[in-house]
Amino acid sequence: SRHIEYHLLEKNNYRVLWVTVSQDFSVTSLQDKIANVLGINLSSRDEEDTRARILRDIFRKMLKLIVLILDDVWEEFCLDRVGIPLHPNKCRLILTTRSLQVCNRIQCQRKFDLQTLDTGEAWDLFKYKLGSEPLLQGDLESIAKSIVEECDGL
């Protein structure tokens, strides 16, 4: 998804907003994260509806097409309740999730199923990203391998 972001930024006719949603989801938290990347503060507003209206108004006033990337979505939610207006000429949404069910419930138009790496490939990638200089020995190697296993090829 970072690759998509960089590609869109190169085109220069998009405003790309990247928000990591994570497992501890709430509408208010997502609204705050979106507001933060937009450079506004919603903390003085308590009502979800008011916060959603403010976000919708900001999105509508943007001159460039907004591409909102919601990364690491764990559960479905109502886009309108958050304040995300989906309009082909104003705002488009890309979301990443491990759950096809989440995509279906949010009514994603297109779904791309990414293949995971097998354990050997994941370990090789981990070592490559670590760099050639540091060598993992003893406990560090076992901890690193447990991290690779926990990521499950993602």
Feature annotation, model-predicted:
Residues 6-12, 52-117:
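A conserved switch/coupling segment of P-loop NTPase cores
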Residues 34-46, 89-91, 99-154:
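Non-catalytic, charged helical/coil tracts that couple and regulate nucleotide-powered enzyme cores
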Residues 26-33, 43-69, 74, 139, ...:
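Mid-core helix/loop region of P-loop NTP-binding domains shared across ATPases and GTPases
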